[in-house]
Amino acid sequence: MILVLVFICFLISLWLVGKNAEQKYQSLLSTIIYDRADTPLSVQSNSKDHYAIPLENLPADFSALLLLKEDRYFRYHFGVNPVSTVRAIYRRLIGQPAGGASTITQQLAKNLLGTEQDRTLANKLRETFYSFGLELYFSKDELLVMYANTVYLGNQLQGFESGSLAYFGKPLRETNFSERISLLSTLAYPNSRHPWQKTNQDFAKALSQQLAPAEIFVYPKVTSRYSFQNSAFFELQTLGVECASTCHSTIDTALTAKIRAILADFVAVERARGATNGAVVVLNPQTSEIIALVGSKNPKSIVEGDQINMALMPRPIGSTVKPFIYLEGFAQGLRPYSLVDDREYKYPIATGFPLYPKNYDGQYYGEVTLHQALSNSLNVPTLKTLEYVGLPNFYSFLDQKLHFQPIQSYDNYQYGIALGGLEMDLLTLTHYFSIFPRLGTIAPLRILQNNFRQPDNLPPQANITKNETVAEEKYIQLVHAVLSDRLTGVNQFGLKSSLNIEAFDYGVKTGTSRDFHDSWVVGYTGDFVVGVWVGNTENTALNQVTGQTGAGTIWHEVMNLLVNSPYYTNTSLPQNLITLLPITPEKNENDWGLPDDIISEHRTRLLEDRLIASPHHGDLFEFFPDSTIPLISHSESLRWTVNGESVGEGQEVGFKPTHSGNYEIVGQAENSDRREIIQISVIPPSR
């Protein structure tokens, strides 16, 4: 009975040894942040100051070579090879070197106990007992993997995966026969016989003949110095990404590297036009995962500005704010077919000076639809839409729906928001655009997987902690119908444009800040959202680089890269809640609206109670013989007089000035007392 109890206690002791070994083993592995494809982004050194990237499984042919070299009878012994042990003792007794008597299990015990340099008899006995515990607690395959992950290979490298990456620049599974032999040759003398040493080559050639004489050994090409911090981790560091234990990020390092190369190539070409920096963000809208985050063209560069993550730097966002203004307008009764008078207006602003908003090209286009206005990124109609929505209402939309936190008081922006003065960082702006492929909802951004806590300073700055509704889906569909229309915007962007990509159903919006300091494009499909910023870290102006010609060039390449990747599944965005309505049947003009719309009610909400649509009060015209100035009413037929003389009746008549000078134009309603008076000037032609 006593012997049975002793044996049971012995087994329990061995089991406890195995349990302790599991903890020791985990403590010897590096804390690693992986990308979404299990590529290491950042590897922290362990308690021994070694870089230890673990493998879960070993390639079968590598396992065979490892066992041939280190422990041919590994599958058959219980931690100790008695034949090798007796042979080693005999050799010591006769004064010869003991040779390699340790099994793989014993070597693993030595690594776990940290007794590699202290080869006393007591330690060897302790390692032997520990080996029995390991064999009892773990399977043979588990022990082999643990050994492969704890061997030291020189240069702070622990484990064959770390050694393979550092010496050959590839994971172990991708190494060839010669590279694997070179790694195995490092064992026993890791500091003097690693692959960067010539002694490794000499030994490896002999070892290959010993282990696999039929194979041809070719001296492998080694890398220079390997970094255990991928360049894609630069942006994660700036976000404060940390993991107490090994974790997985949402980042795709391979995609990030390709995008960074696109950005670097663009800057190399466009440096002459003043563009030295840029940033790109790629999101999965359905999961709100950050797939790629590029805030520098070269984070390893010492050039000023390259150490700044520009994806997190707030800059004026230009016209990229417009879809959100129109979204609120549609929610308050406007429609893509609503008319607005694109002309000069005067607005008082906080500075005390009047604001006379102009379009990008300096022209006014008269009466246009909101569809035309958004497609062509017209400023004045956007401002009129914001005026209709109301500044307090739009501030509330930004605050309450998007949880946006401006860097200045809204009172400092006012109607300047419609002209692109609002500052925002690219990551936040791209996140906000995800409401369109998400059909009106927003969710917290994610850069870490598997319920790891997201970094505290991950934009937006506050309060998006769960899925929230930003807008009704029907209004989202109306905005998308405009943003996805590539034909209506031809006037501003042309038929051949960087905004044209290899996908079908996608939306896009450009932006250019005042005096060309910032170039923006944000666009999306149902599968991803891509935001691009181009500018300079010191905020100097670009040389006539617009959103389309700057950020648009990068956006075009990145979108096509994604369209031709597994990320693109051609997810279509629905239009089931909106419909094409016959706006002016006599002209066969249709536009998007809601099925129950009363067209006449929504059509004129932005029009002032004016009779004359064109010309505008104060317009200037050059005088040419036989030139005609069209007089156009908003809707009803008018009786027209110029300087007291009748020139005709109807919704549109022509007036031919006879000389330069001032002209008073009167439009009199035919069926009421309403009339409108404007003045224009006809000036001599410029020479």
Where are these regions (language model features)?
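Active-site SXXK
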Residues: 64-67, 71, 259, 288, ...
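N-terminal type II signal-anchor transmembrane helix
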Residues: 1-36
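A short, well-structured edge-of-sheet supersecondary motif
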Residues: 30-42, 58, 273-303, 396-399, ...
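A penicillin-recognizing enzyme superfamily signal
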Residues: 249-272, 280, 284, 293, ...
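Non-catalytic, structured segments within soluble enzyme domains
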Residues: 97, 101-257, 261, 404-405, ...
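Conserved catalytic neighborhood of penicillin-recognizing serine enzymes
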Residues: 91-118, 226-239, 334-394, 442, ...
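Soluble, non-transmembrane domains of envelope/secretory-pathway proteins that act on or interact
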Residues: 34, 213-232, 348, 460-465, ...
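Short, well-structured active-site flanking segments
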Residues: 75-84, 158-161, 304, 330-350, ...
